[in-house]
């Protein structure tokens, strides 16, 4: 059975979710990447949309005007680690509950997710057009002076996903754990290979 989170998301909605789980989102998803994080954290400019209980997407979408509405054409995730230095404070200040992106994040985000009860989740890369089909409507747009990729596109999604949980509210970090596991497995394998190819200089 699909695990579907619906905004507004509460802390108790997240307590039984663990890293590695696959979930889906129904409700509000706001594209929010580098400049948005910098404006809030470094420049102290309030975000012109209430993110409390909502989800953000590290993404720079392609949109087009269709009559008096905006239409999502493509919306793929961008590398979440670029926001690592801001994300803990961003979660604290906004009350956002779901951070969607590409790849893992580090210890600051771990701390933010654990302390303020949020998740970081990974949307599969290379599926930007699929993601766009899961956006039912663009409801609002803010900070358009930043250009299309950096604007805040307030989207309504239905069963947006799949989203792989990489950081949960208990401080577990799937990508960090996997890196450690891979390193442990790598060393004996490399050693064995070297025994067979030691003659190669």
Curated annotation (Swiss-Prot):
Recorded catalytic activity of this chain's protein: (2R,3R)-tartrate = oxaloacetate + H2O
Alphabetical list of NCBIfam families matching this protein: PRK08228.1, ttdB_fumA_fumB
EC id: 4.2.1.32
Oligomer and partners: Heterotetramer of two alpha and two beta subunits.
One Pfam family recorded for the sequence: Fumerase_C
Species of provenance: Shigella boydii serotype 4 (strain Sb227)
Active site, renumbered: 37
Family in the record: Belongs to the class-I fumarase family.
Keyword vocabulary terms for this entry: Lyase
Any GO molecular function: L(+)-tartrate dehydratase activity
Enzyme superclass (EC): lyase
Protein name (database record): L(+)-tartrate dehydratase subunit beta
